[in-house]
Amino acid sequence: MDKEDLKRQAAARALEEVRSGMKLGLGTGSTARHFVELLGEKVRGGLDVIGVPTSEVTRADAERCGIRLTTLDEIDRLDLTVDGADEVDTRLELIKGGGGALLREKIVAAASDRMIVIADESKWVDCLGKFPLPVEVIPFGLAATRRAIEKAFTQVGAAGQLKLRDGEAGHAFVTDGGHWIVDAHLGRIPDAPRLAKLLSEIPGVVEHGLFIGIASTVVLAGTEGIRTVERA
């Protein structure tokens, strides 16, 4: 069984939590795309839901699948967000944003009563950091922002390299919000909650890919079946 099959299994398990009348946050990435496609099948079968996409890519996927969409300007609160993750640790802390949608993903997740994270078992780790940590930054003053980010790493006992994410034709990758992303290759993050706080205090940082205290449930699909982990 390949990873795409496992991702789809996790997405199908999360779909069991969806009921008619729900307002849903729709995540971004390969695993979240499986959820959107499966949700579309249910919608065509009569399920009545409305979704808020976390990226323009997800918006296009949802529209193609026939899912009715809205924005957070039009509704107060979401019942549930379903999204993937690049890493999940035993405290349900996450690294997200490998697809570049971390800002909208965090806004939507924070506006939800619950967040279910769907992933294959390879994303489950004891300590975050092997996957590069995305940090969304304003292009202005990038060198100063990078120095401040590196100082924050030192303060939590982490060390590594920052790399500006490449986009098309050799230019910097540009997020849906018009910002850039620097990826931090740290290997290990000793204190993710503290690092999240320090990064959020840097003026040039728009958002970072550490999701702390946001995920309610993680659904992990592996070769031996589905495992569900709830926040303690």
Curated annotation (Swiss-Prot):
Binding site for substrate: 28-31, 83-86, 96-99, 123
Official protein name in the record: Ribose-5-phosphate isomerase A
Active site annotation, chain numbering: 105
Coiled-coil segments on the chain, per record: none
Pathway assigned to this chain's UniProt record: Carbohydrate degradation; pentose phosphate pathway; D-ribose 5-phosphate from D-ribulose 5-phosphate (non-oxidative stage): step 1/1
Any GO MF annotation of the entry: ribose-5-phosphate isomerase activity
Catalyzed reactions per annotation: aldehydo-D-ribose 5-phosphate = D-ribulose 5-phosphate
Keywords linked to the UniProt accession: Isomerase
Transit peptide among keywords: no
Gene: rpiA
InterPro entries: NagB/RpiA_transferase-like, Ribose-5P_isomerase, Ribose5P_isomerase_typA_subgr, Ribose5P_isomerase_type_A
Enzyme Commission code: 5.3.1.6
BP-aspect Gene Ontology terms: pentose-phosphate shunt, non-oxidative branch
Domain of life from the UniProt record: Bacteria
Lineage of origin: Bacteria, Pseudomonadati, Pseudomonadota, Alphaproteobacteria, Hyphomicrobiales
Function: Catalyzes the reversible conversion of ribose-5-phosphate to ribulose 5-phosphate.
